[in-house]
């Protein structure tokens, strides 16, 4: 697909929390900029998260107790909040992943269904 054909993806409600949890589970402690860059890289630039999208999700996940933020220094010696997934976050990731796969399977079945029969 050429870069002209790429259209940014709009996330469904609730999916951002899931992919942030997955990113932290697989990559360890990350600050918001690292999370956004990694998701953009993995999505081949189809997913571009701005601060107005990512930061509220990080605050929400921290309030749920699913991630924990601690202040530290970046490679460029700037202060940043590093996020890690908690044990409760690991459990939430597991259950939310199961729920997502169930929903994705249902949508796929419905898209393939011949409603004429």
Protein language model regions, located:
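Amphipathic alpha-helical recognition patches that constitute DNA-binding helices
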Residues: 15, 19, 80, 84, ...
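Accessory beta->alpha helical hairpin/"wing" motif in late/C-terminal subdomains of nucleic-acid enzymes
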Residues: 85-89
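Short, contiguous hydrophobic alpha-helices characteristic of membrane insertion segments
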Residues: 9-10, 65, 116-117
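N-terminal helix-turn-helix DNA-binding core of bacterial DNA-binding proteins
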Residues: 10-53
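Intrinsically disordered, low-complexity serine/threonine- and proline-rich regulatory segments
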Residues: 1-15, 96
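Amphipathic alpha-helical dimerization/coiled-coil segments
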Residues: 90-117
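Basic amphipathic alpha-helical segments that dock to polyanions
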Residues: 54-61
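Beta-hairpin "wing" of winged helix-turn-helix
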Residues: 62-79, 84
